[in-house]
Amino acid sequence: MRYNVEKIKEIVRKNPTTEIIYFWGHTPNPKKITKSCLSQWYDVYFEVDGVQYHTTEQYMMASKARLFGDEDTWSEIMNAYSPAVHKKLGRKVKEFDATIWNEKKLDIVVEGNKAKFSQNPDLKDFLLGTGDAILVEASPYDKIWGIGLDREAALNGSVEDWDGENLLGCALMEVRDWLNDKHL
């Protein structure tokens, strides 16, 4: 993985004018693609190994259930439409092992987002259009996938104030690099 929050902080320290795109929220704009498409909860269909998903949250939680052999929860996740329900079900996966999940979760999210963005040209164009900007999930509630701060708090502080890992932002930048390398 090329990105982590410490590398991002170092980039910004060396170049304080680095563009940072803060995103959070999944409500689409009916007229154009916006940064809401970066959300795990953004509703768009994509397929992985013959299975269709409608959010990367669904993909992540279904993959979590499969990783631990919980086919019942996998089925519930696949039959639910709400990403909030997917998240809730993902927390109930049987035989869950935090060590294994922590080793696999980022790769799972990268793979889901590769499918999401490569199979939806308008989303791919949006992600590629972010150029070399640092992508940051500005969720005040999430210190794993986000930075633990909302956009306003992040803008009024510095990267040193970020209290989260920003794994989603890192995953999306990884996907952007992959799309650029593949010229898809």
Task: Describe each region flagged by the PLM.
Residues 1-184:
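Charged, low-complexity intrinsically disordered segments
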